[in-house]
Amino acid sequence: MNKRFNSEDKIILAIDGLDVSQAKLLLEECPNIKWVKVGLELFVREGPRVIEILKGLNKKIFLDLKFHDIPNTMRAACSQVSKLGVDIISIHASAGLKALKDSKKASLEGATSVSVKPPLVVGITVLTSFSLKDFQTDLDRNNSIEENVLRLAKLSFDAGLDGCVCSPWEAKMLRSIYKDNFELITPGIRLNIDNKDDQNRIMTPSEAIDNGASKLVIGRSISKAIDPNKALIEIFKSIDSD
């Protein structure tokens, strides 16, 4: 029997760069993984069948497609993906209050129509790939990333969403405002020995949890490790020891 860790519900394994066969092998190597993130690349390549396969492996699924469109389109898209029986879906908070409210309502209605549990709906704030310089230059913004994250998190909360996606840098600020029933999901997680790759606002797993993150999205630190399960267990231990 595998040893259980208190923090197993806090780690979401990102499998976006893998095909289905590779993902299944990785999950066999890492039996303590409860949560899996399916992103745009994997979902476009494999389609809804990847959700069926992961559900067959008894995994909880964060379908991270980051919908961002007019309210009607977002409402229809959220209704459809909610019928797949996933556990969390993501939408861009910058789509606006009406789009967020409509998406949340549609996810409930879509899931209920096929008798599956409605997913949590979380709002994307500012992508972790942005540095402050790039954010202000590329998007022609004069204010800080933190100010924008704060505004978009409030929009998500006011729309009745279940949480938001932010970098671990902003998690402490948001957790001081929003209580534990508001999910703070943080990508941008790296171990001390890792390259930062295309992420900028990053932290280690234990630092992110200490800052108030409720779930951590971790991909390459586990999937590209020489021993993925060993890397995963070290992450669990680092969080559980806090």
UniProtKB/Swiss-Prot annotation:
Keywords: Decarboxylase, Lyase, Pyrimidine biosynthesis. Belongs to the OMP decarboxylase family. Type 1 subfamily. The gene is pyrF. GO terms for biological process: 'de novo' pyrimidine nucleobase biosynthetic process; 'de novo' UMP biosynthetic process. Its EC number is 4.1.1.23. InterPro entries: Aldolase_TIM (IPR013785), OMPdecase (IPR014732), OMPdecase_AS (IPR018089), OMPdecase_bac (IPR047596), OMPdeCOase_dom (IPR001754), RibuloseP-bd_barrel (IPR011060). CDD domains: OMP_decarboxylase_like. The keyword Lyase applies. Substrate binds at residues 16, 37, 64-73, 128, 190, 199, 219-220. Homodimer. This is Orotidine 5'-phosphate decarboxylase. It catalyses: orotidine 5'-phosphate + H(+) = UMP + CO2. It is an enzyme of class 4 (lyase). Pfam families: OMPdecase. Pathway: Pyrimidine metabolism; UMP biosynthesis via de novo pathway; UMP from orotate: step 2/2. NCBIfam families: PRK00230.1, pyrF. The active site is at residue 66. Catalyzes the decarboxylation of orotidine 5'-monophosphate (OMP) to uridine 5'-monophosphate (UMP).
